[in-house]
């Protein structure tokens, strides 16, 4: 169950995910899967460098920045290409006010 969930506007986001006391970078999408004619609101998170089965575990999502709005793609290849670009942005994202 989604307890105490506050979701941002539809789109693709850079996120940090806390699981079991550890933080991981990832990207998440909120919205309807319009490329595949989806009409239900969905939340999906991709945690980078992470391969554990955590279904049923509690996680915390920290919404860091919006990458883009949800887009309907003409085909799966276009979607995959965009997701690869989104991942590149999310992996190397740093806060604007970070002086390091």
Language-model-detected regions and their locations in the chain:
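Phosphate/ribose-recognition catalytic cores of enzymes acting on nucleotide-derived substrates
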Residues: 1-100
């Amino acid at each position: 169950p989604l307890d105490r969930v506050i979701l941002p506007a539809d789109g693709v986001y850079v996120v940090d995910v806390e699981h079991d006391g550890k933080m991981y970078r990832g990207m998440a999408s909120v919205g309807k899967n319009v490329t595949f004619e989806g009409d239900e609101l969905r939340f999906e998170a991709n945690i980078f460098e992470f391969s554990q089965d955590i279904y049923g575990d509690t996680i915390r999502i920290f919404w860091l920045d919006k990458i883009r709005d949800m887009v309907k793609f003409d085909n799966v290849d276009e979607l995959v290409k965009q997701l690869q670009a989104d991942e590149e942005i999310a992996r190397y994202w740093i806060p604007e006010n970070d002086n390091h």
